Amino acid sequence: MTLAEVQGLKIQQDGHTSHIPSFEEFVTRAKELKMPLLVELKPHGAEPENYVDLFVQKMKELGVEKDYPTMSLDLSVMEKVEKKAPEIKTGYVIPIQFGQFENASVDFFAIEDFSYQEDLVTQAHEMKKELYVWTINDEQKLTAYLQRPVDGIITDEVAEAQSLKKNLKKNKTYFDRFLSLVSLSTSEE
């Protein structure tokens, strides 16, 4: 299928009908909603040789190169983006992390919830990188991660995460947070 054909496809979910938007349409709508985006590149192997150049050009054309972090499972793509446009915050998605992080030329690592250990946060910070966890959609896990030293939480439940964060800041003393963490850690076992 061509890009135009894909963008013309109708999609339906939960009684709603729409079409697959272009990247430009998606970014335009996100800007209107003041919704920050985390862009994930998912190369499939048949990209043009100038794929990274095209992406960087599009981010700059849309004026979001300093606003929207970008990540991928493909480390080489992210290192190319970092080299060509250091102003774009780049991340390496790691589905399962054991041991030490690879010394990668990116700004952050994104690890799956399953792989999270607090020493990974320390390790990332020592490498001058941030650590994000994904995909955290459960209220209990969101609450726990909001009280851990991670730099970012990737979630589909943005409004819920923002509400939980606001409530934690507003209503909790340090002792309350400690009790909450103890309660969460015993319920996770």
Regions found by a protein language model. Name each.
Residues 15-20, 91-189:
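C-terminal active-site rim and adjoining tail of enzyme catalytic domains
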Residues 1-89, 111, 125-127, 183-188:
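Metal-dependent phosphodiesterase/phospholipase catalytic core, i.e.
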